[in-house]
Every structure is written in structure tokens, then in C-alpha cells.
């Protein structure tokens, strides 16, 4: 039997992590692995680029509400998730005030997952996956809501640009079997934030993959030939407009 992999992702709006995920999916061999993709919300321009052989799991109501406006949660009756998110915002703000940092406060995402994940149902609970991948922070959901033999958490973040509550977040990273970093620089800043993980052999570097198939599909979405001809063939050069 082929290894069975689950990949957990928020949604597929246009973004760096989303593009990296599509690249990874296109690089995987459907003859060698089976992949289930769980998206918290089935939205985003990148949805159309999911390879046909990937099994996209159906949405689950609680997950689709995780990043919707609080007012929308209240209107739809998701009071517990709304309350958990408000509490997360309060705790995150309290922790941020104590740190005396001038960096943007990114700890709110960790705390939101910390308090909302216990309220969510399991993802495809009848299946125990050979590998579960949490492709974007926060990583509590893949840790707590997926049955898997091994787990990998992905890092896309330059930790010199944000503030996180490293002490509170460390236990989540520590419970993963592996941590995939997209570059040596990302690894460096991550280990500066979580130095105790340096000697654990958890970190593997997996560079983002830009699939030629994906590039061709994006190029075919919209025909801009008319616009190029309108401006004299679309010739460009450095420091000169079309």
C-alpha cells in the first residue's frame, strides 16, 4: 500500500505559503503516495491549481469559522469559538505588553489555536495517516485533531520580523517528529527563538518547489496579448515603462 498523507492548510488565497503548497503537491508522485488535503475554508484563487489526483476533504463548519469576523461567528451560532478567539486576543495582548518588543505581535495566532482547537472535531477520524503535515502555523490542529504515525510542521517565517510567545509555543513544536524549514536563514531565526530545539535533529530543510506545470497553468489563465500589442509588443527594460 502507498503511504497515506494528510496536509492541513487554512485556505488557498494567493500567497507565498499557498504557492509553496501547490508546488509541493505538483511535485509529489501520485503513483507513490495518496494525499488528502484538508482546507479550513474552501476559498482562494489557488484552489484551481490543486492536482486532480489529490483528495480534497469536505469542509467542516467549525474550521471554516476560525478566521471569519467575530460578528459572523455570532450570527451563525458559533458562540464558543467566538468567545475563545476573544479570550486569545486578550491573553496575547497581555503577554505582548510584558515582553517590551517593538515587533508585530504574532502570538495571537498561537493563542487562538490554543483555545479554539479543543472545540473542534477530529479531521477524518476513521483514518490513521502515515504522515500528517501542518503546512502553516499555528500547528495545534494537526497535532491534536489528526490521527497519524508521524507529523511534520512547516516553517515559512522569518522570526526576526515578528514577536511570538516562545515559552508558550515551544511545547507545540516539541511534539512534532520533524520541523520542515524552507531555507537556512529561516532555520537560523527559528532556532534563535527556540534554541532548545537546536540539538533535537527535528529540523529538515525543504526548499519551496516551483512546479513548471503550475507556472504554465498560471500563464494560461488570462490572455494578455491584446494589452501587450496595445503598448507596442510589450517590450520592457530596466528603469523604463512599457
Residue spans of the language-model regions?
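Membrane-proximal helix-turn-helix segments that form the acceptor-binding/catalytic region
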Residues: 117-128, 160-182, 186
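Active-site proximal beta-strand in glycosyltransferases
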Residues: 131-159
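Short His-centered aromatic/hydrophobic patch
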Residues: 92-97, 113, 133-139
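N-terminal strand-loop element at the rim of the active site
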Residues: 10-14, 33-105
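Alpha-helix capping/helix-boundary segments
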Residues: 43, 138-139, 185-187
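Donor nucleotide-sugar binding/catalytic pocket of nucleotide-sugar-dependent glycosyltransferases
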Residues: 152-156, 160, 175-193, 197-218
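Conserved donor-binding/catalytic core segment of Leloir-type glycosyltransferases
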Residues: 6, 225-242
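Short N-terminal targeting/anchoring amphipathic segment
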Residues: 109, 120-137
